Amino acid sequence: MSISPAIDQLVENLKRLPGVGQKSAQRMAFHLLERDRGGASRLAESLQSAVEKVGHCECCRTLTEEPLCRICSNPMRRENGVLCIVETPADVLAIEQTSQFQGRYFVLMGHLSPLDGIGPADIGLDELERQLQSEPVEEIVLATNPTVEGDATAHYIADIAAQLNINTTRIAHGVPVGGELGYVDQTTLGHAFSGRKQFSR
């Protein structure tokens, strides 16, 4: 049953968001229209503004309003010599929030997936190779997701790095802080054991 074509269209577009199904989209739509029309207008304006102003960094390909993002335009970050490879701009934000990494990034905007027709050129690996050949990089940190596709992508990049004699490391995967072993899947637990390190007191 349809109440309004405009509401139907709003619900359909809200369903484009990750993890949002029909029911969630309907709840959001009705909340905005019933209780928060001012918020709905601000949401529409900010979304329109972001779509118009935000593009990709010319160097690392993350999202930014400038030709170079704030990380790539920072001389100290560029001279660090460490390049972290991630799948999405959200990964950059997640790593930056830890304050543990002081190098720069290269954002793939995805991962290798031959079954979906996504090859090396589709995620910018040709561009990455050109950068590695032209700019001094001492270490590559592979921070792709711990999935079959993420691991395949990491291996592909490691092969490129090996040909250029660049040291390659992979972020550790294991048991999350606060997690209970009984709820951890076998693959994650296996990674945790193979990546164990000396206990420091």
UniProtKB/Swiss-Prot annotation:
Molecular function GO terms recorded: DNA binding; zinc ion binding
InterPro entries, sorted: DNA_Rcmb_RecR, Rcmb_RecR, Rcmb_RecR_Znf, TOPRIM_dom, TOPRIM_RecR
CDD domains, sorted: TOPRIM_recR (cd01025)
UniProt xrefs under SMART domains: TOPRIM
Domain Toprim per the UniProt entry, residue ranges: 81-176
Keyword entries, A-Z: DNA damage, DNA recombination, DNA repair, Metal-binding, Zinc, Zinc-finger
Gene3D superfamilies: 3.40.1360.10, 6.10.250.240, RecR Domain 1
Gene Ontology terms: biological process: DNA recombination; DNA repair
Zn-finger region bounds: C4-type: 57-72
Pfam families: RecR_C (PF21175), RecR_HhH (PF21176), RecR_ZnF (PF02132), Toprim_4 (PF13662)
PANTHER family, sorted: RECOMBINATION PROTEIN RECR
Functional summary from the UniProt entry: May play a role in DNA repair. It seems to be involved in an RecBC-independent recombinational process of DNA repair. It may act with RecF and RecO.
Annotated family: Belongs to the RecR family.
Designated name of the protein: Recombination protein RecR
Gene behind the chain: recR
